[in-house]
């Protein structure tokens, strides 16, 4: 009997051990119960930290690439103005390159833009000449406002150099263009009855640091003369 029980007990023990081994394979390792040592375990922790940091860096880099920086309103307007000027040069007869552009071509471009203006500029024969608020409509032409032209030239002057142009050959910075803008400003100021003079800002007065309500403190009295005993 005892010899028959031993194989049965051995078989049961083998079955139990096999089930335990299978459970150990299916169950995830519990890292909390076995803290990392200074050798291999510490290295594993470092790899995990490096992996998380690299993953965070890649995700942040991916997020930055997915959301490109939107150009400012000034930069977007400058790009549109430069494209418009480039189209004007291509449609010119004969077509002009950027290196061939001069101040005369800039003046032609500014006069060309007048047909798209929205500012009423009264002629000398108009009864509303010099009237800032005309009470009735008139057949005077629409022109580009001086402020719009001045800002346009400033943007194109910067765009010319940003696109490879040399500052000494910038056609938007020549004297003829500056004189034209001055004439437009003076003529529109007279015709529209407005003033384009910049208001002078008042200089801030220095703050009173005396602390006496605006009245300076009197100087301290002189020290008393030394006594006769002290002199001896």
Curated annotation (Swiss-Prot):
Stated name of the protein: Protein G1-like3
PROSITE patterns: ALOG
Protein's cellular compartments: Nucleus
Task of the protein: Probable transcription regulator that acts as a developmental regulator by promoting cell growth in response to light.
GO function terms (MF aspect): DNA binding
Gene Ontology CC terms, in alphabetical order: nucleus
Residue ranges, compositional bias (Gly residues): 38-53
Pfam families cross-referenced by the UniProt entry: ALOG_dom (PF04852)
InterPro entries cross-referenced by the UniProt entry: ALOG, ALOG_dom
Residue ranges with Pro residues bias: 216-232
Residues in ALOG domain copies: 73-200
Sequence motif Nuclear localization signal, residues: 198-202
UniProt family annotation: Belongs to the plant homeotic and developmental regulators ALOG protein family.
One GO-annotated biological process of the protein: response to light stimulus
Region (Disordered): 20-77, 189-232
Keywords noted in UniProt: Developmental protein, DNA-binding, Nucleus, Transcription, Transcription regulation
């Amino acid at each position: 009997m005892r010899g028959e029980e031993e194989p049965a007990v051995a078989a049961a023990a083998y079955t139990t051990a096999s089930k335990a081994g299978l459970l150990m394979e299916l169950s995830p390792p519990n890292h909390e119960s076995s803290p990392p040592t200074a050798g291999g375990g510490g290295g594993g922790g470092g790899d995990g930290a490096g992996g998380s940091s690299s993953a965070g860096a890649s995700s942040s880099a991916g997020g930055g690439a997915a959301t490109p920086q939107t150009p400012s309103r000034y930069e977007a307007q400058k790009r549109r103005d430069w494209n418009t000027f480039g189209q004007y040069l291509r449609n010119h007869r004969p077509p002009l390159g950027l290196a061939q552009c001069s101040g005369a071509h800039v003046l032609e471009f500014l006069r060309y833009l007048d047909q798209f203006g929205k500012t009423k500029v009264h002629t000398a024969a108009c009864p509303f000449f010099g009237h800032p608020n005309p009470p009735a409509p008139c057949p005077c032409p629409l022109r580009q406002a001086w402020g719009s032209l001045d800002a346009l030239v400033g943007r194109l002057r910067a765009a010319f150099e940003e696109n490879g142009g040399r500052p000494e050959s910038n056609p938007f910075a020549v004297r003829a263009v500056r004189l034209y803008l001055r004439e437009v400003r003076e003529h529109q100021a007279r015709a529209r009855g407005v003033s384009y003079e910049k208001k002078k800002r008042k200089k801030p007065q220095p703050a009173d640091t005396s602390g006496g309500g605006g009245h300076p403190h009197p100087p301290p009295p002189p020290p008393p003369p030394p006594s006769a005993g002290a002199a001896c």
